[in-house]
Amino acid sequence: SRGLGDVYKRQVLKEALETLSEQPGCDFGMHVIPYCHQRGDKIMAYNYQGYWKDVGTLSAYWEANMELIDIIPEFNLYEEFWRIYTKTDVIPPQYFSADSKVNACIVGDGTEVYGEISNSVIGAGVVIEEGAVVTNSIIMNNTVIKKGAKIEKSIIAESVEVGENAELGVFEEAENKYKPKVYSGGLVT
């Protein structure tokens, strides 16, 4: 539930996740915690008052990322107290060609934009070629979006190459026949 942080011993959590991995739609709060409780594992929680967002579905993950683009997002990465301590690769800053178009995006270091990006979160080391259009999407690190590709409301994994003139997410919304509860919502992954 919102505002509660759960702490687990690694081995206990690993065993629970392995046991429940085959269960369709396995959810932490609905399945893992009750499973550990039934097994007699010690369960502890603490009242957490900071930012928290359930990103247990692709739609929720997409929404949380899109919220980062808001003028003043609830989870404001630019607040002085939100220091990010991490080891990062030494790569050049972003590059935007004279012909590129950028509107309301977060763009990682080393990214080169020759096309058009709007309302998107773009990871580090991404290349968006001339004529490519990315809208309302999450593009993870080291991905190449080739010339003329159109990507809309999609989550693209890292180190992927989207081919020339490919179209992802540019369609009428349709129910996913394989896992409708997991993948419905107009997202392409």
PLM-predicted stretches and their roles:
Residues 14:
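Nucleotide phosphate-binding site architecture
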Residues 3-8:
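Short, small-residue-biased leader/transition segments that mark boundaries at the very start
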Residues 11, 19-189:
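Left-handed beta-helix
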Residues 1-2, 189:
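General structural signal for secondary-structure boundaries
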